[in-house]
Amino acid sequence: MVPTRLFDCIEMHLKDAPNFTMLAGKENGEWIEYSTVKVSELVNRLSSGLLYSGIGPGDFSIEGRDKVAVISKNRPEWVMLDLAVQQVGAVLVPVYPTISEVELEFILKDANVKLIFVNDPALFEKVNALKKNLPNLKEIISFEKIDGVRNWRDLLLPLTENILGEIRAISDKIQYEDLATIIYTSGTTGVPKGVMLSHKNVLSNVIDSLPCFPPGENMKALSFLPLNHVFERMISFIYLFKGTSIFFAESIEAIAQNLKEVKPHLFATVPRLLEKVYEKIMEKGSELKGIKRSLFFWAHRLGLKYDVNKKFSVLYRLQLSLANKLIFNKWREALGNNIVCIISGGAACQVRLLKLFTAARIPIMEGYGLTETSPVISVNRYEEENRMFGTVGPLIENVEVKFSEDGEILCKGPNIMMGYYKHPDWTAECMEGEWFKTGDIGVMVGKFLKITDRKKEIFKTSGGKYVAPLAIENKLKESRFIENIMVIGAGEKFTAALIIPSFSNLKAWCHENNVQ
């Protein structure tokens, strides 16, 4: 079948792989796996419960469709809710669990949310405290058990032919161009912007990104980036359409343990988490003594020389092979020993990390995009010939870019959002005809897109010199003693930097060097 809606991912695998593990989560210390058949059953039963609760497509217009919010950590129920909401023609509005009460109230009011699913008692209390200010809100439902609160399982009505027929009658009317989700992002206005994404936006991005991924069947992925973010959500749909099992990590703190348990082939991450992994590795390497320490830093130096676009001598290749057997194999073991590649996005990844991990046979597919572009514009492919360190890769199929006079990246394609919810004025400001203005400055290096800075972050000193801070910040952040940094100097004689030190690494260094 040719999918035209995001929820078609179930139908695609139902006949050929009914017992394939589609989703998995840990409950009471055990991994609970959900097959394609089980996911299909639960999604249909949840769809039935949503319809019975008065949630549906209304008149099938953007305003007419009911809005359902989810405020939860990653878990199988999150994805099943997403698919069920889509299937009944409603719209899912994901919200970060850590969001402030002020922003939460604004989003729930702005979207006219009728039903909210929360993860746990703490989030229930957070939403319940706002309920008096939310006249459209009918009910708060919890994934975890809370006394006196309806649980998501209470919505799982028994399936009958009549109910299935009712669900099919609605889902058959849902079109490729229809609204699928509203994702709120913090905008320059200070007010969250509701980005409207259609099935076409996200599904075209999924289909056009699939060829960039490594080949292979029966693969497993570990999911820990928030599904509230378009990056992890779209990657999850890639897994669902590709037939890759998604295992949801218990928490950020449990990732290391979950990697060893699940032994995934893939996972998506942000550069900061990779930096933390690297810092841990370097910390352990620094604690080694004698020959082990010498071998560790020899392998490290070899890795820093690696480049996917360079031909190396036989001697270097032999040395790197030895380094992989003696040192880098421990890196792969820490990630579960099955990693085929890591997908990185959300910010620029340090080139030294790309070099080291790739040398250690852990390729990193670094990509680029925004919520408004569903999100992928470009990505470094799995194949080495389509990767270049320091860039965000070639454009994906059916997506075009051009550059304005000041170097801003403009993007056009089926992935460009429908617009900002209730704000055609904001939409008009960020569009130039069919071209979306990304706000990022970039250049093409051959077929590879390179981001040089954020347009709004470039500043001018009092001497008239323009400064692009991103490259400076990324270089300085390579120091393990710097947690975060911001280059400043607009209107001043010189540039400076505000630095947040990495106190844990500074303390360790002081201890090693007898500094009181």
Features from the language model and the residues they span:
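Conserved pre-ATP/AMP-binding loop-to-beta segment of ANL
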Residues: 18-21, 142, 147, 161-184, ...
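ANL superfamily adenylate-forming
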Residues: 124-176, 281-330
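Conserved ATP-binding/catalytic segment of the ANL
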Residues: 394-461, 478
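Conserved structural elements of the adenylate-forming
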Residues: 40, 44-48, 176, 195-216, ...
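Conserved AMP-binding/adenylate-forming core of the ANL superfamily
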Residues: 22-75, 79-83, 100-105, 153-159, ...
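Conserved AMP-binding/adenylation subdomain of ANL enzymes
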Residues: 203-220, 227-328, 338
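Conserved AMP-binding A3 loop
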Residues: 33-36, 180-206
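Conserved ATP-dependent adenylate/AMP-binding module captured primarily in the ANL superfamily
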Residues: 99-129, 205-222, 252-266, 334
